[in-house]
């Protein structure tokens, strides 16, 4: 792949903008020598403004999502993509969140541009456990382990029961919940 296309695909700018970066001497090798658009240089030796290039396709990011942000790309409010360097929004292929966390939920969020990895992790067939820590408004009742683990718990307005879930009490109003599925506001609705 030509350097212009590679650098543009990593989100540093359009091909035209990247061509201008070459013209301005902003693209160099690891030794600081100015590169030209048709040079053949290994990815790890290319620098933009003295900084190494971002990783190519196959990027996997771990992000601590604070409350108040959504995992959508189209939300008019604050989105998790705003927490990343602006060029990450221009990557090709695009970065996608691995699952979602509600606006009012904080925690680890994975992001990737690897569609196959995304599918392997998020596919319901994978049954990969997802662990959440819930802070509750009232004390645990004490029967949550039995109810959540039964595989018969029905959420309001749902037609199928939830898959069995694990729960560990961390305090009177704190619990660690392990799910193998992810329904809309599932944990909030399980404790309702």
Regions found by a protein language model. Give the residues of each.
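Basic, flexible Lys/Arg- and Gly-enriched helix-loop patches that mediate nucleic-acid binding at interfaces
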Residues: 1-192
């Amino acid at each position: 792949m030509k350097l212009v296309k590679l650098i543009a695909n990593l989100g540093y700018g359009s091909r035209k903008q990247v061509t201008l970066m070459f013209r301005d001497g902003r693209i160099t090798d690891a030794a600081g020598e100015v590169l030209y658009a048709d040079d053949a240089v290994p990815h790890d030796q290319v620098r933009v403004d003295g900084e190494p290039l971002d990783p190519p396709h196959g990027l996997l990011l771990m992000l601590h999502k604070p409350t108040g942000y959504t995992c959508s790309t189209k939300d008019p409010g604050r989105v998790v993509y705003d927490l990343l360097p602006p060029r990450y929004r221009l990557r090709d292929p695009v970065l996608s969140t691995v699952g979602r966390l509600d606006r009012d939920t904080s925690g680890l969020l994975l992001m990737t541009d690897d569609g196959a990895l995304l599918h392997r992790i998020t596919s319901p067939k994978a049954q990969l456990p997802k662990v959440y820590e819930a802070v509750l408004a009232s004390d645990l009742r004490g029967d949550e382990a039995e109810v959540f683990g039964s595989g018969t718990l029905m959420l309001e307005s749902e037609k199928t029961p939830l898959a069995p879930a694990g729960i560990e009490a961390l305090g009177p109003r704190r619990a660690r919940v392990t799910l193998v599925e992810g329904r809309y506001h599932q944990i909030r609705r399980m404790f309702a």
